[in-house]
């Protein structure tokens, strides 16, 4: 099975090109859906890719949304309103919900990802629990493994409980995996979960993604 996903050439400078050329040593382990991305393993990566990822992660600019015209902004506001209604049971506080959706949109678009897919992945990974921790230590909304803070961040895994930081790591890492897999989302999701080539996790994300489907 193969899910095709378009590669964003504009993502964080040259990272997309670098990642597709990356020579990796993949350390894969057995699959367990309950642990979600907690099965993800650290991989060897080229210094240039590590540097580009680190630059993306440490960019401290606030998530200010940019729209090409008023129509795009109106479409975003409609999207946020509908997603907010769907999220009420998971995130009851309106301000928290709106800030979360604002950040999901920003980080997904920044990494060239579909915000609906990111919402589906978060549903599978953490059930929208900000402080979720897997049995092996993956943290936050997107269940980011702490080793990423050492590899491309400042080494502080506690920051993975910060909403924007967690979404930044999760979206950046998934974007890298998509590029590494030449746009094959099925394999990229498997790599994110540590179960490359197995169907259960990618299929779970795809099913959740459909539940967040949105038509403009």
Identify the function of each model-found stretch.
Residues 59-216:
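Catalytic glycan-binding domains that act on GlcNAc-containing polysaccharides
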């Amino acid at each position: 099975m193969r899910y095709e996903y378009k590669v964003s050439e504009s993502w964080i400078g040259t990272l997309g090109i670098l990642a597709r050329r990356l020579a990796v040593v993949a350390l894969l382990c057995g699959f367990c859906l309950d642990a979600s991305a907690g099965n993800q393993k650290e991989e060897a990566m080229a210094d240039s890719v590590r540097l580009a990822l680190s630059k993306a992660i440490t960019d401290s600019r606030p998530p200010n949304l940019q729209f090409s015209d008023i129509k795009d902004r109106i479409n975003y506001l409609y999207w946020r309103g509908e997603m907010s209604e769907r999220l009420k049971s998971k995130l009851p506080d309106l301000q928290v919900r709106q800030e979360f959706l604002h950040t999901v949109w920003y980080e997904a678009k920044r990494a060239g990802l579909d915000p609906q897919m990111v919402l589906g992945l978060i549903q599978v990974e953490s059930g929208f629990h900000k402080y979720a921790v897997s049995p092996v230590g993956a943290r936050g909304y997107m269940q980011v493994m702490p080793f990423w803070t050492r590899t491309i961040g400042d080494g502080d895994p506690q920051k993975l409980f910060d909403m924007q930081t967690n979404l930044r790591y999760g979206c950046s890492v998934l974007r890298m995996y998509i590029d590494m897999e030449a746009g094959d989302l099925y394999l990229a999701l498997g790599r994110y979960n540590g179960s490359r080539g197995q169907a259960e996790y990618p299929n779970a994300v795809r099913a959740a993604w459909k539940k967040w489907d949105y038509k403009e």
